[in-house]
A protein has these predicted regions:
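A ligand-binding cleft/hinge motif common to bilobed small-molecule-binding domains
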Residues: 64-67, 76-86, 134, 165-195
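Extended ligand-binding regions for polar small-molecule ligands
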Residues: 38-47, 114-120, 127, 202-235
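Acidic, polar ligand-binding/catalytic clefts
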Residues: 42, 54-115, 127-129, 191-192
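Hydrophobic residues within well-ordered alpha-helices
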Residues: 44, 66-67, 116, 157-162, ...
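Ligand-binding cleft/hinge of the Venus flytrap
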Residues: 41-50, 91, 128-150, 159-161, ...
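Extracytoplasmic small-molecule ligand-binding "clamshell" domains
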Residues: 12-81, 85, 147, 226, ...
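Periplasmic-binding protein-like
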Residues: 19-21, 95-99, 182-220, 239-242
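Short loop->beta-strand "edge-of-pocket" segments that line small-molecule binding or catalytic clefts
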Residues: 15-27, 113-129
């Protein structure tokens, strides 16, 4: 452990991370970044004796700052060609899924992309969710995808019937669970599973050195091995990635 801390101290002293409102993975509580991923980042930085700051921003601004190298890291990040081009990505930390939701009065249930023909599908984007949805619809015509600025607004619009009687939305199931419980959106129901997904932390290729990235990964490995990472995730009802 001493060697790990000594090596990491020489690699970096201050890191600036950005994230978004994506509860329970990350969210703001006043001026404090809270949620599972901020706890994991803070625990890793404490282990490494790094000074780390986490800022909660609208996703597009956070992503732009990270891609431009204005900040060191960003989360949550999926495995995709665009993300790998811009970021060094940690091993996946948490696994979840993208599910469909609709009004209880709608009998829609998703089994395959063809089921979405003739439907308007709402999704938060541009985001990892919208990327995965659009990839799944490449060979499926007659589907209108509507991008919405955040998941909270997405579910409120669905609840208000803004996507029509046959409208559906797709979003992260853990985010949906959190928002439905906290906003009492019990007129909504799960309408099927799109795909499983895992998230990690991205480090800007324009800002962070390979040595810094490797040191952070070693810190994450220590948290994984001593059970602290799983304990943090379980506190938020989340599943560690394999």
């Amino acid at each position: 452990m001493t060697a790990l801390i000594a090596a990491s101290n020489s690699a970096a002293e201050n890191l600036h991370f950005v994230t978004e409102e994506f509860p329970p993975f990350s969210y703001s509580r006043g001026a404090i970044a809270s949620g599972a991923l901020p706890e994991i980042v803070n625990a890793t930085c404490l282990l490494l004796q790094w000074r780390c700051r986490i800022e909660v921003l609208p996703w597009r601004r956070a992503l732009q700052q990270a891609e431009d190298g204005e900040v060191d890291g960003i989360f949550t990040v999926i495995q995709s060609p665009a993300r790998h081009q811009a970021f060094l990505i940690t091993p996946m930390l948490v696994t979840s899924g993208y599910d469909f939701y609709t009004l209880r009065s709608n009998n829609f249930h998703y089994r395959q992309p063809e089921d979405l023909r003739g439907h308007q599908v709402g999704v938060y984007g541009p985001s990892g969710t919208s990327f995965v949805l659009q990839e799944s619809l490449k060979n499926t015509p007659d589907v209108e995808v509507k991008l919405v600025t955040n998941n909270h607004r997405l579910l409120l619009m669905l609840n208000a019937g803004r996507f029509g009687e046959q409208g559906v939305v797709v979003l992260n199931r853990d985010v949906a669970r959190h928002l439905i419980e906290h906003e009492y959106l019990y007129a909504l129901r799960n309408a099927g599973h799109l795909t499983s997904i895992s998230y990690g932390i991205g480090f800007s290729r324009k800002k962070v050195s390979p040595a810094q990235f490797q040191a952070f990964n070693r810190g994450l490995g220590t948290l994984r091995n001593n059970g602290q990472l799983a304990t943090i995730l379980q506190r938020y009802g989340l599943q560690p990635a394999n």
